[in-house]
Amino acid sequence: MVGAFIMQGSEKMYRFNIKEISKEDALRMIRKYHYSNTLPKINKYFLGFFLDKELVGVVTLGWGTRPRHTIQRIFASLDTKDYLEIGRMCMTEEMPRNSESQMLSQLVKWIHRNIPELKILFTWADGMVGKVGYVYQASNFIYAGYSDGEMYMKDGVKIHVRQMKSFLVPGGQKDSRITVRPTIEQMKKYGILHFKGKQYRLYTGIQIITFWKKRSRCSEFIAVYTGFWCKSYLCGRWD
């Protein structure tokens, strides 16, 4: 089935045809419908969501700039092979407002069928641009704290601090620093804006797995099952 929908109450329930697409096709959609206009550097899957052969949504899966650090902040026993991160997700503007939640639900099922060894699907909600992860909350993702962050923007395009070298270090000149932050004078010269804020961690589970997370005087038991979470607290709380 290429694509279909059924009615449930007053809302359409879409059945997407999900298949891998080229990086170029994904990037065209992202540039048109995603606020960042860019792709993360480490991408493993470019997934297209089709209705009647029309590409209406895109999700990229891969890892961020510090893959191992990211997952081990939540689960110390896991590694990069155990999770994938949603790098970009977007849909055409014609799709109804509940469509992204349906897309996420069907994405989890696609992962369960095609990457059965995966344990965690992870994402960030970019609070610095007013994103607090409503679509992920509606899709049963679990909030896992936040990270203080910063970003730069030039000509309306978000620039990660690790990309600053391309603007500030002359071509051919070696610089051993991982990040290079611009001075006030350089920001004025190149028209770069600087923002500080929070990025929110959210995740959902793909497999049945059990973790013990040690706290000062208590432990927490968390069971994960195909996108639905059951949490049983022995004491303490998850934050």
Model-found features: residue ranges?
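Acidic, Ala/Val/Gly-enriched low-complexity intrinsically disordered segments
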Residues: 2-4, 223
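Acyl-donor binding region in acyl/amide transferases
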Residues: 20, 62-192
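Low-complexity basic/metal-binding stretches
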Residues: 200-203, 211-221, 225-239
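A short catalytic or substrate-binding loop motif that flags glycine-/basic-rich loops and adjacent residues
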Residues: 39-43, 194-197
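Extracellular structured ligand-interaction cores
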Residues: 44-46, 138, 199-201
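Short amphipathic alpha-helix that is part of the acyltransferase structural core
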Residues: 5-41
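C-terminal catalytic/acceptor-binding lobe
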Residues: 187, 191-201, 206
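Conserved beta-hairpin
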Residues: 30, 44-63
